[in-house]
Amino acid sequence: MKLLFVMMLLFFMFLWYYNVNFLSFLILMEFLVITVLFFIIGYEINSWLFLIFLVFSVCELVLGLSLLVSMNYELGHQKLSVMDLIY
């Protein structure tokens, strides 16, 4: 239970800290995916669950990067570097 509380606290701290731009938010999401993957490996949960989670995390990464590239194409590099997530 303490581990879950610490992970939630880290998630909200990183979410508050990385609320600067979209790329930092994507890096935060990948950090959380790697944390959950280590949790699955550490507790030796079913290998099929590991593969399914790995497939979903790769799809999430590809979707996020494609959104970043399309936003860079539409808005331009200068506007993307100062854009906030709330925009």
From Swiss-Prot:
Give the EC number. 7.1.1.2
- Molecular function via GO: NADH dehydrogenase (ubiquinone) activity
Instruction: Name the membrane topology term.
Output: Multi-pass membrane protein
Which Gene Ontology cellular-component terms appear in the entry? Answer: mitochondrial membrane
Domain of life of the organism in this record? Eukaryota
Q: Does the keyword Mitochondrion apply?
A: yes
Q: Please give the catalytic activity noted in the UniProt record.
A: a ubiquinone + NADH + 5 H(+)(in) = a ubiquinol + NAD(+) + 4 H(+)(out)
Q: Which UniProt keywords apply?
A: Electron transport, Membrane, Mitochondrion, NAD, Respiratory chain, Translocase, Transmembrane, Transmembrane helix, Transport, Ubiquinone
| Subcellular location, record wording | Mitochondrion membrane
Kindly list the residue ranges recorded as spanning the membrane.
22-42, 49-69
The similarity comment for this entry is: Belongs to the complex I subunit 4L family.
| UniProt function note | Core subunit of the mitochondrial membrane respiratory chain NADH dehydrogenase (Complex I) that is believed to belong to the minimal assembly required for catalysis. Complex I functions in the transfer of electrons from NADH to the respiratory chain. The immediate electron acceptor for the enzyme is believed to be ubiquinone.
User: What is the recorded name of this protein?
Assistant: NADH-ubiquinone oxidoreductase chain 4L
Organism, scientific name: Apis mellifera ligustica (Common honeybee)
The taxonomic lineage of its organism, from the top, reads:
Eukaryota, Metazoa, Ecdysozoa, Arthropoda, Hexapoda
Q: Coding gene?
A: ND4L
